[in-house]
């Protein structure tokens, strides 16, 4: 990742912990499995929005050591750790499904740590926008892995309504310290 500072206008006021906790959706296992088929992670991974451990558990099942933290205490990993306030990385790689409203802030914070790799699961539409274009350029986005099909719906925890598939396209956005050149585009099943 580029060591250049990420000067991104805040896309709204920084949300309070209680609001950020409400933007919690479990990551489908198929999303993490797909990432691991196309990206290698050398060394431990920090999952800074671990929730109940959906990403962490899959990584551990693949033999990847994980440091799991979350702003909200959910009984998995270390709670009450605000990734956006951390002063340094807890592992050489970062993989997470960030709160959507704070995805840009998560990307900029991760870039400030200059990790080996960062992978953020975000809506494909997150790629759009002038300020995000500048952020991607300044932080050295390496690859975008687009899901060919829709991921299973990531319902909010506690959702009691009908289960359904998602109408939203998702992608893994990957920053790689060893990548040079423009971002590459690839597809996942």
Question: How would you describe each model-predicted region?
Answer:
Residues 1-189:
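Class I S-adenosyl-L-methionine-dependent methyltransferase catalytic core
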């Amino acid at each position: 990742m580029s060591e250049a500072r990420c000067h991104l206008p805040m896309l709204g006021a920084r949300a309070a912990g209680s609001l950020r906790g409400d933007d919690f959706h479990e990551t489908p296992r198929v999303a993490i499995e797909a990432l691991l088929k196309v990206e290698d992670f050398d060394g431990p991974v920090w999952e800074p929005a671990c929730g109940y451990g959906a990403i962490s558990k899959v990584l551990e099942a693949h033999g990847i050591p994980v440091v799991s933290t979350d702003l909200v205490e959910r009984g998995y990993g270390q709670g009450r750790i605000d990734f956006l306030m951390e002063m340094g990385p807890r592992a050489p790689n970062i993989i997470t499904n960030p709160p959507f409203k704070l995805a840009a802030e998560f990307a900029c914070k991760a870039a400030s740590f200059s990790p080996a790799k960062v992978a953020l699961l975000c809506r494909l539409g997150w790629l759009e926008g002038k300020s995000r274009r500048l952020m991607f350029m300044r932080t050295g986005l390496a690859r975008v892995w687009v899901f060919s099909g829709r991921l299973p719906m990531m319902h909010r925890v506690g959702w009691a309504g009908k289960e359904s598939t998602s109408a939203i396209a998702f992608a893994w956005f990957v920053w790689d310290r060893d990548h040079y050149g423009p971002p590459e585009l690839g597809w996942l099943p």
